[in-house]
A protein has these predicted regions:
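Composition-driven recognition of glycine/serine/threonine/acidic- and proline-rich low-complexity segments
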Residues: 1-169
Length: 169
C-alpha cells in the first residue's frame, strides 16, 4: 500500500491497570491519538486497539490517499483509511495468535475514535472488569516515518484462558 518498508516488532508485553497506566505508557498516555478498535470473541474475548499518534495519522492518511490535512475530505479519509489499516494490522496480529494457539477468533467491524489515550482506556475499562495487556507492537514505516501500537484488552477471566492456552504449547 505504501510502497515502503514496513516493520512490525514486539519489544514488550505489559499488563497494566487502566486507572494507572504507568511509566511504560507515558509516550501515549496523555497525548492525542487516533485509534481503531475491533472486538474479538473465541476462547478468550476482548478488544484489540491500534493506536496512532496524531502526527503519524496525518502522514499515513496523506501517503495512502493523497488527501492533505487541511483539505475538506481529510476527516472522512482519516476514518476510512485507519479503519482499513487497523483491520489489516489487527487481523494480522490476532490471526498470528489464533494460529499459534490453533483456535479461531471472530471479530467485529472496526470502530474509529480520536481523543486522549487515557480517556479511551478508562471508558473501555469502566464497562466491564477488564485486564489490559499491551502487546507493544511497534508499527514503523521508514518513509514517511509512521508509528503505532497495538493494545489487547481482555475481559476479566479471558486473560486466564489465554495464558492456559499458551501454557499448553
Amino acid at each position: 500500500m505504501l510502497e515502503s518498508h514496513i516493520e512490525l516488532e514486539v519489544p514488550s508485553i505489559i499488563m497494566f491497570d487502566p486507572e494507572n497506566p504507568g511509566e511504560e505508557l507515558t509516550d501515549v498516555s496523555h497525548n492525542d491519538i487516533a485509534s481503531v478498535q475491533l472486538n474479538f470473541h473465541g476462547p478468550f474475548s476482548g478488544s484489540a486497539v491500534l493506536v496512532f499518534p496524531s502526527e503519524s495519522v496525518e502522514k499515513l492518511v496523506t501517503a495512502l490517499t493523497g488527501e492533505k490535512p487541511d483539505s475538506e475530505g481529510f476527516a472522512k479519509a482519516t476514518s476510512e483509511t485507519l479503519c482499513e489499516v487497523g483491520n489489516i494490522l489487527i487481523n494480522a496480529v490476532m490471526g498470528s495468535i489464533a494460529n499459534l494457539l490453533a483456535t479461531q477468533i471472530d471479530f467485529s467491524t472496526p470502530n474509529y475514535k480520536e481523543g486522549k489515550f487515557t480517556d479511551l482506556i478508562k471508558s473501555k475499562g469502566s464497562k466491564k472488569a477488564m485486564t489490559f495487556l499491551l502487546i507493544r507492537t511497534n508499527f514503523k514505516v521508514q518513509d514517511p516515518q509512521i508509528s503505532g501500537n497495538v493494545f489487547l484488552i481482555f475481559e476479566l477471566g479471558s486473560i486466564g484462558d489465554l495464558l492456559t492456552a499458551i501454557d499448553k504449547l
